């Protein structure tokens, strides 16, 4: 099993690479790519950790050597948020980066499962899909927007509020991956209930958690460590499913049947070919249903922006 991390010299990429070096199954290969010349050195640094995961780093304009034979590609390349920016302000820079990297994936490892971490995810996933489609290699069961950070944040905040162990809580999060498009299904957590005010306040905190980190870092960056953890969780789940483990379920932002929007985050059963089944989002509370209806225009506009970036 070979996993490639693109953007591996950045804050998320280095944290992700460290976690994967420690947690990938024995015998796996990990390849790190970034435009920054430090990248082969990051790989050497990590290679001193005594786990049975082979690691190699590549830098420069060409990601091809890192991508050859990859089963899973995780893309965290791009610029980070600064105070006063929202995820869509990143669009102008990050759209071009994702387009370029996905073009290289289409040529070098078209059958790989691809997880997009680069924000704004609502839009960058649409860009990736259109690039793969143009190259004639798009498989909607193998392209994912990684929204796992919304899930782990929800688990943490719910556990804090309700005095539970964070490991005991698993909150499904649907929709998209920015602002109002993030919708935690708080009504679906077994054995936990919320007043309407609690649900509204908690939902808002989960939606704004990225901004909370950006402001707390006082201009020094955005959520890199928790995002690295989230991306590792998703990547490792994908690897386990690709290796034949049954019953692996994660929420991610994928192209589905278009019931809500062309791309939509929902619980997915993962398997040997990526998405095995898009699971139902179940019954929503009145608050959740209202939030879902209210966000769809925003989500659809984000998606359109990505489609237009490639097709116009």
Swiss-Prot record:
Pfam families: Ldh_1_C (PF02866), Ldh_1_N (PF00056). Substrate binds at residues 81, 87, 119, 153. The active site is at 177 (proton acceptor). GO terms for cellular component: cytoplasm. GO terms for molecular function: L-malate dehydrogenase (NAD+) activity. InterPro entries: L-lactate/malate_DH (IPR001557), Lactate/malate_DH_C (IPR022383), Lactate/malate_DH_N (IPR001236), Lactate_DH/Glyco_Ohase_4_C (IPR015955), Malate_DH_AS (IPR001252), Malate_DH_type1 (IPR010097), Malate_DH_type1_bac (IPR023958), NAD(P)-bd_dom_sf (IPR036291). Gene3D superfamilies: Lactate dehydrogenase/glycoside hydrolase, family 4, C-terminal, NAD(P)-binding Rossmann-like Domain. It catalyses: (S)-malate + NAD(+) = oxaloacetate + NADH + H(+). Keywords: NAD, Oxidoreductase, Tricarboxylic acid cycle. GO terms for biological process: malate metabolic process; tricarboxylic acid cycle. The keyword NAD applies. Its EC number is 1.1.1.37. NAD(+) binds at residues 7-13, 34, 94, 117-119, 227. Homodimer. Belongs to the LDH/MDH superfamily. MDH type 1 family. Catalyzes the reversible oxidation of malate to oxaloacetate. This is Malate dehydrogenase. It comes from Salmonella dublin (strain CT_02021853).
């Amino acid at each position: 099993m070979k996993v490639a991390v693109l953007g591996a010299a950045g804050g998320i990429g280095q944290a992700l690479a460290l976690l994967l070096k420690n947690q990938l199954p024995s015998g796996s290969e990990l390849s790190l790519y970034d435009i920054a010349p430090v990248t082969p050195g990051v790989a050497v640094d990590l290679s001193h950790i005594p786990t049975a995961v082979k690691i190699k780093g590549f830098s420069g304009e060409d990601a091809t050597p890192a991508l050859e034979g990859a089963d899973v590609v995780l893309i965290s390349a791009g610029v980070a948020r600064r105070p006063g920016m929202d995820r869509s302000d990143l669009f102008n820079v990050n759209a071009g980066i994702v387009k370029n990297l996905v073009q290289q994936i289409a040529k070098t490892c078209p059958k790989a499962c691809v997880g997009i971490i680069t924000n704004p995810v609502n839009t960058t996933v649409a860009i990736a899909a259109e690039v793969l489609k143009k190259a004639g290699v798009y498989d909607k069961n193998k392209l994912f927007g990684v929204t796992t950070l919304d899930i782990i944040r929800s688990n943490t905040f719910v556990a804090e509020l309700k005095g539970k162990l964070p490991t005991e809580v698993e909150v499904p999060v649907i929709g998209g991956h920015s602002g109002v498009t993030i919708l935690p299904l708080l009504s679906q957590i077994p054995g936990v209930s919320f007043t309407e005010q609690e649900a509204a306040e908690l939902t808002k905190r989960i939606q704004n958690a990225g901004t909370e980190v950006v402001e707390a870092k006082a201009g020094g960056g955005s959520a890199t460590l928790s995002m690295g953890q989230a991306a590792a969780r998703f990547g490792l789940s994908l690897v386990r499913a690709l290796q034949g483990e049954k019953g692996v379920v994660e929420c991610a932002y994928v192209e589905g049947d278009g019931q809500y929007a062309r791309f939509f985050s929902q619980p997915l059963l993962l398997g040997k070919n990526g998405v095995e089944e898009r699971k139902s989002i179940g019954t929503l509370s009145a608050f959740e249903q209202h939030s879902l209806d209210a966000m769809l225009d925003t989500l659809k506009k984000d998606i359109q922006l990505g489609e237009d970036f490639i097709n116009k």
